[in-house]
Amino acid sequence: MDKIGVLLMNLGGPERITDVGPFLYNLFSDPEIIRTPFPVFQKPLAWLISTLRSTTSQQAYLSIGGGSPIRRITEQQARELQSKLRDKGLNATTYIAMRYWHPFTESAIADMKADGIDQVVVIPLYPHFSISTSGSSFRELKKLRDADDEFKRVPMRCVRSWFSQSGYLKSMVELISEQISLCELPSKAHIFFTAHGVPKSYVEEAGDPYKQQIEDCSLLIINELEKCLGHTNPHTLSYQSRVGPVEWLKPYTEEVLADLGRSNVNDLIVVPISFVGEHIETLQEIDIEYKEIAEKAGIKNFRRVKALNTHPTFIEGLSDLVISCLEGPQVNLEEASKLPEKVKLYPQEKWQWGWNNSSEVWNGRVAMIIFLVLFIELISGSGPLHKLGIL
């Protein structure tokens, strides 16, 4: 019987406060997250941003216990998925590849080679595909695989996105239903989907399918929820976690919360639709920041649906996903990592420079100006930032 390796790809997160700076550096070193006009500037810019953001981010992690639980939860998901697959007769072993913190993709590849895996199934723990999440992880895996003659020979099948998978939808409905049942008037409870945002240019200029998949997913969940409950609840979709000067997908979560408060919504069921495990965006951003905004807006009952974590229906769904990937049409790593044909952002292989209206280009220009100003002041020891007391 073939030895199957199931590779679960995720973001990763700092486990201790001292990890926050290096984690942010890794994050912003990824050109799929922030893009500069010349690759030589990528790492200096990542250092600048991670240095400026480190203190604020450390405070956020301190508010949830001093570190991210994402590795612990992902390891629990991997163990339970492995057990479920073996119960179904597969000789499967699960591995974890984090994009920006330990255990990195290189570590997972080394473990699979050492274990003599015969074929690999790759599952990104992002239900919805985006250039900056699954896309970045697939491209990193492809780069490492292409450079490894031994690992390159191992057959590999990939799942690009899985937001419409029945087990995922069913588990979301079960968790949402639990919170709705706590409301005095369940049919009046407002379901508030909040998804991690991406820059608007990723969708409009680069053809990222993320926004469409999020919208389709929220409607699928609402339809399944109606079948389960026998009524349709009012619902809204918004996007959170935006950073930087460029425009991100709208509507923004904090603005919608204020609008719902003005509309006299009393029972709010907050659904973190793009997160399969608890981490900083659920535990701090939603549970602390957005809850405070909602309460100030007059929303009386703020109920947040738990992330999927190791919910039994979700783990069952993941096992079905692995089996269907093995039995269905093959999607190889080349296809999974391929960006949409429409791409206008600068691909990693073709760094260009030009005067056009791309917000990503302007983001790069502004970032370069900030970096040069900071660099000059650090060298000279004087300038406007020193006068303002920033340096």
Swiss-Prot record:
Fe cation binds at residues 196, 281. GO terms for molecular function: ferrochelatase activity; metal ion binding. GO terms for cellular component: cytoplasm. The keyword Chaperone does not apply. Pfam families: Ferrochelatase. It catalyses: heme b + 2 H(+) = protoporphyrin IX + Fe(2+). Keywords: Cytoplasm, Heme biosynthesis, Iron, Lyase, Metal-binding, Porphyrin biosynthesis. Its EC number is 4.98.1.1. It comes from the Bacteria. InterPro entries: Ferrochelatase, Ferrochelatase_AS, Ferrochelatase_C, Ferrochelatase_N. It is found in: Cytoplasm. Pathway: Porphyrin-containing compound metabolism; protoheme biosynthesis; protoheme from protoporphyrin-IX: step 1/1. GO terms for biological process: heme biosynthetic process. NCBIfam families: hemH (TIGR00109). Catalyzes the ferrous insertion into protoporphyrin IX. Belongs to the ferrochelatase family. This is Ferrochelatase.
